[in-house]
Design a protein with these regions (language model features):
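Membrane-embedded helix-loop-helix hairpins and adjacent transmembrane boundary segments
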Residues: 1-566
């Protein structure tokens, strides 16, 4: 890190935090804090994207592409369909009821226990995910500054809490517009830099050709196997379910589009996300592909996390084993480089050998990673998550390093602020306010802010354990998939099956959640199918249970919140 990098990083982060605090300095009521103000569609769309695009996205996805290629893009194939369905069928209901949280709808449709069960599932899943979102930039700052994870977690966490507590939903939205612009510019700049750094004559077409020979360009895998993690069908079906659950029932996203100036603005914001999100994720994956191709001409390291590798080498015999693997990697790289050069000169027969050598390199790196996991102290960052950061620090010019680090910090602030804002709002609205129905507006505002601070402490505490996970982007998605299916099932029963009442869906949700956890612990089913299984189980069990228990006393009518536009 040079002086210019520090200047870019510090100026960017301080400007965003200051902007959020200043723009929302007049927030004085609970309604303004929880609901926000009338946002236009581009603010809503960018805020939705920024909420999902955490620092984990920018750290892990290039590493995911480096290791496994473009297949991860299939995870997002169901997203555009989900946006259309939510914009036309779910959003109007939320706005008509003038809800602060999605879970208030469940009390109007079922009863309070169903509302609070679903809200509790959200609090658990999003509270843990917020910790993961904090850990990712802590990984960056630890690598650059050498600070302990606890200090870096605290630094980023406190910054996110500062402007979220200050301005609530509006502060999150106005800062995310800037953050998303910085993220997109940074990743586009990274891709163009790596593309320019390739040998003369390679270019975009040559990059795609080499990546294809390495087996990295399979963006669509039409497999029907349930144990294959990313396929066309798991993306379209499982991805649709997870997107419906995430954007339709996760308060961190629902809160983004409930703040629209009108139904039309909120609806257009969702459709904006449908158009832009998949290309953005493709760009981030292509950064990883570009790094792969770059390292067909310049030897890559055996291990990307040099800190963990250095610690593992202290164990008896490990240094010799890693040195032997490194020597074999040099031989594999030399042979593969020769094959790639032949391919670029028109020799198509080199492709099988290139692919075989790529698999050999992955095997060598896998052996080395296993050695490190067994011998390094616990709590190290995974090797895959270190790929992009290590490449940036080694190869990017001054200024661009600072911009890319700012991208990662901005993404962390954005995702963490959205999560804390939603966690605080859900705790206050769905749990505290029913206990204090006569609370004044000032008391409600104070409670929401205190809950936000409390969840910030929880997230920072959990972040200390995130480094035990193998790949952060997959950990976040698996965590969400465990809870999202049952949550979506409850909402779908509410919207589609009008005869089913609260007790039946409440018991069905508990049983389905237990089944999904058992599936996660005891099977090899790809995690995207957890969403489908959980949702279908809730619906099926609720139908059966309602037939058994029969009609029950209807829930009391839900009183819409004041101040919202229908």
């Amino acid at each position: 890190m040079r002086t210019l990098d520090w200047a870019v990083l510090i100026a960017t982060v301080l400007a965003i935090v200051s902007w959020g605090v200043w723009k929302t300095r007049r927030i004085r009521t609970a309604d303004a804090y929880l609901r926000g103000e009338g946002d236009r569609f581009w603010t809503i769309g960018l805020s939705i994207m920024a909420t999902q695009a955490s620092a984990i996205t920018f750290l892990s996805m290039p590493g995911q592409a480096y290791d496994d290629g473009l297949g991860f893009i299939q995870f997002y194939f169901g997203l555009p369909i989900a946006m259309v369905l939510l914009a036309w069928f779910v959003l109007p209901v939320y706005r008509r009821l003038r809800v602060y949280t999605a879970y208030e709808y469940l009390e109007s449709r079922f009863d309070r226990k169903t509302r609070q069960l679903t809200a509790a599932l959200f609090l658990v899943s999003r509270g843990l995910a917020a910790g993961l979102s904090l850990y990712a930039p802590a990984l960056v700052l630890t690598a650059v500054l050498g600070w302990p994870l606890q200090i870096t977690n605290l630094t980023v966490g406190v910054l996110a809490v500062l402007y979220t507590v200050s301005g609530g939903t509006r502060a999150v939205s106005v800062t995310q517009t800037l953050q998303m612009g910085i993220m997109l510019c940074g990743m586009l700049g990274a891709f163009l830099f790596v593309l320019h750094a390739l040998p003369a004559g390679v270019g975009l077409a040559g990059m795609a050709r080499v990546a294809g020979a390495l087996g990295k360009m399979h963006a669509v895998v039409p497999s029907l196997r349930f144990d294959t993690r990313y396929t066309l069908w798991s993306g379209l079906v499982g991805g649709l379910f997870v997107a419906l659950a995430y954007f339709g029932t996760d308060q961190s996203q629902v809160q983004r589009y409930l703040g629209g100036a009108s139904l039309r603005e909120s609806r257009t914001g969702l459709l904006f996300n449908a158009l832009i999100k998949v290309p953005m994720q493709f760009l981030i994956l292509m950064v990883g592909i570009a790094v792969v191709v770059f390292h067909q001409f310049e030897r890559p390291p055996l291990l990307w996390n040099s800190v963990a590798a250095g610690q593992a080498r202290q164990a008896p015999g490990v240094a010799a084993q890693l040195d032997a693997l490194d020597a074999r990697l040099s031989q594999t790289f030399a042979a593969k480089r020769a094959g790639v050069l032949s391919l670029l000169q028109g020799d198509e027969s080199a492709k099988p050998a290139i692919l075989a050598l790529e698999e050999q390199e992955k095997s060598l790196r896998g052996e080395a990673r296993a050695l490190v996991r067994r011998n390094a102290p616990p709590g190290q960052a995974s090797d895959a998550d270190s790929i992009f950061l290590t490449f940036v620090l080694r190869h990017f010019p001054p200024g661009l390093v600072g911009l890319l680090l700012a991208v990662i910090i901005c993404a962390a602030l954005s995702a963490t602020a959205s999560a804390l804002n939603a966690l605080g709002a859900t705790s206050a609205v769905d749990f505290w306010r029913p206990l204090r129905p006569q609370a004044t507006d000032e008391e409600q505002l104070r409670a929401a802010r205190l809950f936000t601070v409390g969840w910030g402490v929880v997230a920072m505490s959990f972040a200390a354990f995130a480094s035990l996970l193998d790949n952060l982007i997959q950990a976040v998605n698996i965590l969400g998939s465990i809870f999202y299916g049952p949550m979506l099932g409850v909402f779908l029963v509410g919207f589609l099956l009008k005869r089913i009442q609260g007790t039946a869906v409440f018991v069905a949700a508990l049983a389905a959640q237990a089944c999904v956890v058992a599936m996660w612990l005891a099977s090899d089913v790809g995690f995207l199918w957890y969403n489908v299984a959980g949702c279908v189980l809730v619906i099926a069990l609720a139908v059966v249970l309602q037939a058994v228990v029969g009609n029950a006393r209807p829930a009391q009518p839900f009183k819409a919140n004041p101040g919202g536009a229908p």
